[in-house]
UniProtKB/Swiss-Prot annotation:
<dbReference type="InterPro" id="IPR002172">
    <property type="entry name" value="LDrepeatLR_classA_rpt"/>
</dbReference>
<dbReference type="InterPro" id="IPR000082">
    <property type="entry name" value="SEA_dom"/>
</dbReference>
<dbReference type="InterPro" id="IPR023415">
    <property type="entry name" value="LDLR_class-A_CS"/>
</dbReference>
<feature type="active site" description="Charge relay system">
    <location>
        <position position="646"/>
    </location>
</feature>
<keyword id="KW-0865">Zymogen</keyword>
<feature type="disulfide bond">
    <location>
        <begin position="525"/>
        <end position="544"/>
    </location>
</feature>
<feature type="disulfide bond">
    <location>
        <begin position="566"/>
        <end position="585"/>
    </location>
</feature>
<comment type="similarity">
    <text>Belongs to the peptidase S1 family.</text>
</comment>
<feature type="disulfide bond">
    <location>
        <begin position="299"/>
        <end position="322"/>
    </location>
</feature>
<feature type="active site" description="Charge relay system">
    <location>
        <position position="694"/>
    </location>
</feature>
<comment type="subunit">
    <text>Forms a heterodimer with SERPINA5.</text>
</comment>
<comment type="function">
    <text>Serine protease which preferentially hydrolyzes peptides with Arg at the P1 position.</text>
</comment>
<keyword id="KW-1015">Disulfide bond</keyword>
<dbReference type="GO" id="GO:0005886">
    <property type="term" value="C:plasma membrane"/>
</dbReference>
<keyword id="KW-0325">Glycoprotein</keyword>
<dbReference type="GO" id="GO:0006508">
    <property type="term" value="P:proteolysis"/>
</dbReference>
<keyword id="KW-0812">Transmembrane</keyword>
Length: 843
């Protein structure tokens, strides 16, 4: 036994319990905590006591923490900061909710209509306070609500309102309604008109077995073909539904022989009028307009619009008038109802309308005619409801027959032409004549169309989206083997003119076909008969060496279509007397108002180059659409420009609001004067497929100041029927592309010298050249106008006085600068009377 054990066993035997003092302590504080051994540490063997900590010094006691009060300064600052943060979050949230509800949401209005076939019309439906009207309105509104509250636009749908319930010529009820959506402005771009209309149309369940257009819309029998839904204006919604009904009136007409007047006028304030016209079932409405007094601004503010419905639905527009007129015009509906809206929100002078409407029966446009056996015209055919504008979707059928196989049928039109139909379709009616397709187009002269057959079937299908101009033609028979009389020339227009008028320098055929493929006559300068060569006499060009062809040109002679007429009705032979710098008329009228191109000596050129110098072409204008250069134009007065009609073709481009004119500009973006465009006047006969009548006038909102006359000047308008000679040098200018393959236009104004091309060569190259066009360029293809130059000037300098003449307007061509394909320009001299109609100050 070791020493330690021996000491314990050797305890005194007299030891008593009373001698032992016991100290009780907390076991939790004093007892050692049993912890697992650390890695690598050996546990004590069983039966062996663990080593004891030496008992020498007692462990010092921990000092107890001092209790700190909760509401001290530091905690108060923290709590106050948290409170301010929470308050700021709440304020920003409320502000965001307010803005999102008030400023960031827009209302979208849609006007529509459809026909319910299983409900018969009752007279009580005309009274909007009647139980019958309220009942059917409630039913329709519930159906529309169900359609859109279960659609993808459900969270944006606001309400639907039935505006009118009317009869119609197809039976049942024709319901007109508004649908209103409200959505955040940021999402407005995804809200499409076609999407809204598709939801309504797709909700109509049609039967495949019955193959009918009538289907079920939540229990309503709706004609699918009658469904129309277009985006509308808030002002139209307010004036037809809301409290701002203005001068809205409802007319129900049931007497055929009466004229129901529509007259309203005001000298100040505003006019926002809606006239709802309804006729008895089975009849149509004809509106006749005597006069309109409005501000001419392309219907931006003032307008008169005629609808084939009782709500202002865009796709049901029959016609829109944007200019004042005193010429009688009449329009016919396709159903027994019509809406006429007159708007003049800012009346500066007297505005108003004088018109009347009447109830007329439907007409069938068909006839069978047995033509006489003698040649000549004997009767007339016309468009439906002539002389009214004929409605869209009309159809006419005529059958002509002659008893002789040697005779064919001829149609003589007064302002219309029929040509072979192309792949592009027809804008003003398509014709099927003996199973051949043709297109119709309007023009300002007569044409004759011949069918070499004794039996002719003709069908006219009205293809215009709007009501179109009245159409009148004479019919008769002709000799198939000899269409024109002996001694006559047959024009490409179908007309017959005396052979003596061929190649006489006068456009007798109206299409210049009598002046093509002519050998230029040489004047007999040394004989007394040289006066018979009219085109070469007094034309401003010296054809005789002795100048005899240009002598005695201002001697008074009887007036004809080749003479110049002074203000006092005196005529002489001089062809281009207007504004040539020489006073030829006794009253000086030939030089009145000639302020164009006054500073020609100040013009600088870089011959052979491409860039111009600043002020080089002071009549050149850059037209910007929505801020970007789009077309060119020419200054012809202080507030009028001349350009090409194709620059403004279409609904968006014809609106003057997005257009601005940049004058006195050399580098794009550095114009000396910029003005919004107030008005765009496109020629009424413009043909977007052939580019015929490709001319337009633009009126500036602000006239350019006289202080800029060194950098901005009008170019001279040519005299009516001005003759030009092939090979004459002219200049085409613009900011268009330098090459056909370029992606963008030039920043610096470009110029190119071109030659006028012989009209016969021009027609031979393109084939579809009219007398209102001319060709210019270089046949090698080195110089030409290009994309972006459209509407810009073709400027030619007159030798007699050095003034610059606006000979042409950049119109079209085959590519740009291609060999053997010169550019095609609008011949301005053919439109001088049309220009004077709108700009009389140039007279």
């Amino acid at each position: 036994m070791d020493k330690e054990n021996s000491d314990v066993s050797a305890a005194p035997a007299d030891l008593k319990i009373s001698n032992i003092s016991v100290q009780v302590v907390s076991a939790q504080k004093k007892l050692p905590v049993r912890r697992p051994p650390l890695p690598g540490r050996r546990l004590p063997l069983p039966g062996r006591r663990p080593p004891q900590r030496p008992i020498g010094k007692a462990k010092p006691k921990k000092q107890s923490k001092k209790k700190v009060p909760f509401w001290n300064v530091q905690n108060k600052i923290i709590l106050f900061t948290v409170f301010l943060f929470i308050l700021a979050v709440i304020a920003w949230t409320l502000l965001w909710l307010y803005i999102s509800k008030t400023e960031s949401k827009d209302a979208f209005y849609f006007a529509g209509m459809f026909r319910i076939t299983n409900i018969e019309f009752l007279p009580e439906y005309r009274q909007k306070e009647s139980r019958e009207f309220l009942s059917v309105s409630r039913t329709v509104q519930q159906v529309i609500n169900l359609v859109y509250t279960t659609s993808a636009f459900s969270k944006f749908y606001e309400q639907s309102v039935v505006a009118d319930v009317s009869s119609n010529n197809k039976g049942g009820l024709l319901v007109h309604f508004w649908i209103v959506f409200v959505m955040p402005r940021a999402k407005g771009h995804i809200f499409c008109e076609d999407c809204v209309a598709a939801i309504l149309k797709d909700s109509i369940q049609t039967s495949i077995i019955n193959r009918t257009s009538v289907g079920s819309l939540q229990g309503l029998a709706v004609d699918m073909d009658s469904v129309v839904l277009n985006a509308g204006l808030r002002s139209d919604y307010s004036s037809t539904i809301g409290s701002d009904k203005g001068c809205s009136q409802y007319f129900y007409a049931e007497h055929l022989s009466l004229h129901y007047p529509l007259e309203i006028s005001a000298a100040s304030g505003r006019l926002m009028c809606h006239f709802k016209l309804v006729a008895i079932v089975g009849y149509l409405i004809r509106l006749s307009i005597k006069s309109i007094q409005i501000e001419a601004d392309n219907c931006v503010t003032d307008s008169l619009t005629i609808y084939d419905s009782l709500l202002p639905i865009r796709s049901s527009i029959l016609y829109r008038i944007c200019e004042p007129t005193r010429t009688l015009m009449s329009f016919v509906s396709t159903n027994n109802l019509m809406l006429v809206t007159f708007k003049s929100p800012h009346i500066r002078r007297l505005s108003g309308i004088r018109a009347y409407f009447e109830v007329i029966p439907e007409q069938k446009c068909e006839n069978t005619v047995l033509v006489k056996d003698i040649t000549g015209f004997e009767g007339k055919i016309s468009s439906p409801y002539y002389p009214s504008y004929y409605p869209p979707k009309c159809k006419c059928t005529w059958k002509f027959q002659t008893s002789l196989s040697t005779l064919g049928i001829a149609l003589k039109f007064y302002n219309y032409s029929i040509t072979k139909k192309s792949m592009k379709g027809c804008e003003h009616g398509w014709w099927e004549i003996n199973e051949h397709m043709y297109c119709g187009s309007y023009m300002d002269h007569q044409t004759i169309f011949r069918v070499p057959s004794p039996l002719v079937h003709i069908q006219l299908q009205c293809s215009s989206r709007l009501s179109d101009k009245p159409l009148l033609a004479e019919y008769g028979s002709y000799n198939i083997s000899q269409p024109c009389p002996v001694g006559s020339f047959r024009c490409s227009s179908g007309l017959c003119v005396p052979q003596a008028q061929r190649c006489d320098g006068v456009n007798d055929c109206f299409d210049e076909s009598d002046e093509l493929f002519c050998v230029s006559p040489q004047p007999a300068c040394n004989t007394s008969s040289f006066r018979q060569h009219g085109p070469l006499i007094c034309d401003g060009f010296r054809d005789c060496e002795n100048g005899r062809d240009e002598q005695n040109c201002t001697q008074s002679i009887p007036c004809n279509n080749r003479t110049f007429k002074c203000g006092n009705d005196i005529c002489f032979r001089k062809q281009n007397a207007k504004c040539d710098g020489t006073v030829d008329c006794p009253d000086g009228s030939d030089e009145e108002g000639c302020t164009c191109s006054r500073s020609s000596s100040a013009l600088h050129r870089i011959i052979g180059g491409t860039d111009t110098l600043e002020g080089g072409w002071p009549w050149q204008v850059s037209l910007h659409f929505v801020g970007s250069a789009y077309c060119g134009a020419s200054v012809i007065s202080r507030e009028w420009l001349l350009s090409a009609a194709h620059c403004f073709h279409g609904n968006r481009l014809s609106d003057p609001t997005p257009w601005t004119a940049h004058l006195g500009m050399y580098v794009q973006g550095n114009a000396k004067f910029v003005s919004p465009v107030r008005r765009i006047v496109v020629h009424e006969y413009y043909n977007s497929q052939t580019f015929d009548y490709d001319i337009a006038l633009l009126q500036l909102s602000i006239a350019w100041p006289e202080t800029l006359k060194q950098l901005i000047q009008p170019i001279c308008i040519p005299p009516t029927g001005q003759r030009v000679r092939s090979g004459e040098k002219c200049w085409v200018t613009g900011w268009g592309r330098r090459h056909e393959a370029d992606n963008k236009g030039s920043l610096v104004l470009q110029q190119a010298e071109v030659e006028l091309i012989d009209q016969t060569l021009c027609v031979s190259t393109y084939g579809i050249i009219t007398s209102r066009m001319l060709c210019a360029g270089i046949m090698s293809g080195k110089r030409d106008a290009c994309k972006g130059d459209s509407g810009g000037p073709l400027s030619c300098r007159r030798k007699s006085d050095g003034k610059w003449i606006l000979t042409g307007i950049v119109s079209w061509g085959h590519g740009s600068g291609r060999p053997n394909f010169p550019g095609v320009y609008t011949r301005v001299s053919n439109f001088v009377p049309w220009i004077h109609k709108y700009v009389p100050s140039l007279l």
